[in-house]
């Protein structure tokens, strides 16, 4: 028995050696750490034996990934891929790049794409293709939204009869959508392209544009936050119209302005401070420390949840109103469906679908499904809102019709020597709708003005 046991132990030991030889690249965590630690020691010894240059230069250092020698200011350093990588044999000919600034300080940017695991390149290329297509989609969506929102904002601003609290809130919402679209499109122009960087000029340009890129990132976060808060203002105001019997809008609009434009600063400013202190890397477009990202994400999720609850509450009110008025609205189910679809983009209800799915949970197909859903609807949301609440709005169409009739009266076109027949302004078919488009504080029956717009 002892001999058999000894032979078994020798066989297992030989098998382990064979596996270690055949799988030399499959290092354990402990082995990888030891190789990384030895690489750092060798780097430190090399730097101590090297005499620093006399001119302005970046100090030699080990940045926890690669060993950087002393480098002259305003140049790009290049070192071979670190040999402690498990796949070093496949990337031995690759290099890591880092920019030394004109002030003799290392830039936060580092390009190690040539040293990445080649086995992941295929999956990376597929993901890159999907992300590039999604970028094209939201670029088209935000550009279209930007154009239509600008036109809608001009229309609501020019016609004085459309000036009321409801449309003032719409105008601020349109502005927030425009700022969001403009900030995202501008940020994309300042961010580096997807995938590996080519050439030695890219780090220099990227380092020079770093401040502008981070500024654009901060403005983007503020504009996105303002967009969500103005969606919340729309929900709060609509709920106020339907529920509160005695309502006075004096002073309320100032509170709405403070909430819409002031609330985002309450979480964007702390995010900027914490990000600068604890994760001041690249253009701040990546959120490696999730706790910092939740400073912005938590208030946005709260606004989404509140708006969804308001949406459910409003639907309940509309159902009860429409059921009590079946004599006037016999097709109330169809009108309820139309009302629901109309309210969804105004309140951003679509955000609830993937709101419970966090960034940590979204992996693989779920991640791309979440990205595609949110990117498509969010980029075209401004376009839908401008169409639903401006271009096909009866009050807006009536004002445009009045303007056209007024212009026709000022510039008559005689036909066959016959004087043109004057058309009174009051003959417009939607004149009654305009007379009813008064500030909501003058309407004494709660919910009637909203219900009439759906019936």
Swiss-Prot record:
Cell compartment(s), UniProt: Cell membrane
Tissues and organs where the protein is expressed, per its UniProt entry: Present in the pancreas as well as the gut, adipose tissue, heart, pituitary, and inner layers of the adrenal cortex, whereas it is not found in kidney, spleen, or liver. It is also expressed in several brain regions, including the cerebral cortex, hippocampus, and olfactory bulb.
GO MF annotation list: G protein-coupled peptide receptor activity; gastric inhibitory peptide receptor activity; glucagon family peptide binding; peptide hormone binding
Key word Signal present: yes
Main location: membrane
Cytoplasmic side: 159-166, 240-251, 317-338, 396-455
SUPFAM superfamilies in alphabetical order: Family A G protein-coupled receptor-like (SSF81321), Hormone receptor domain (SSF111418)
Glycan-modified residues: 59, 69, 74
Signal sequence, renumbered to the chain: 1-18
Post-translational events: N-glycosylation is required for cell surface expression and lengthens receptor half-life by preventing degradation in the ER.
Cited function: This is a receptor for GIP. The activity of this receptor is mediated by G proteins which activate adenylyl cyclase.
Name this protein carries in UniProt: Gastric inhibitory polypeptide receptor
Species, as recorded: Rattus norvegicus
Gene responsible for this protein: Gipr
